[in-house]
Amino acid sequence: MTFWSHSHPRARKAHRCDMCSRRIDPGETYLRGTGLDGTAWTWKECAHCEAARLIYDISDGGEEYDPDLFDGWASGVRGAGPELRAAAGYQSRWRTQSGALWPIPMRAAA
């Protein structure tokens, strides 16, 4: 039997993003996945990684979460514009040098 669910809770304590490894601070909203697929599992993804994954379709076409897909995407982005900024944000764990969070990536206006 396979079961999974997703929610967007507000962090009450610090968590670690399973995609970029950055700290999800208390008060931040994040994606939390839970499932049972032979074994029980949980998945936490910061709002930045979730937005980038959805905007730039970073997936293998399945339901699997794989940080290697993000690494491949970020290292393969060329040119300029919002996608390059998002890749740079991911590579810096969505933090500026001073420690402030980058803005959450947004889909470019058509």
Residue ranges: model-predicted function:
Residues T2-A14, G35-A40:
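Short, flexible, mixed-charge glycine/proline-rich loop motifs
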Residues C20, Y30-L31, A52-R53:
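Conserved short hydrophobic patches within well-ordered secondary structure
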Residues C17-C20, C46:
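Short cysteine-rich clusters marking metal-coordination/redox-active sites
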Residues W4, Y30-R32, W41-C46, D71, ...:
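Ordered hydrophobic segments in well-structured contexts
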Residues M1-H8, I58-A110:
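Short, intrinsically disordered terminal segments enriched in charged and Pro/Gly residues
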Residues P26-Y30, Y56-S59:
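Short Cys/His-rich "knuckle" micro-motifs
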Residues T42-E64:
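Short metal-binding segments enriched for Cys and/or His
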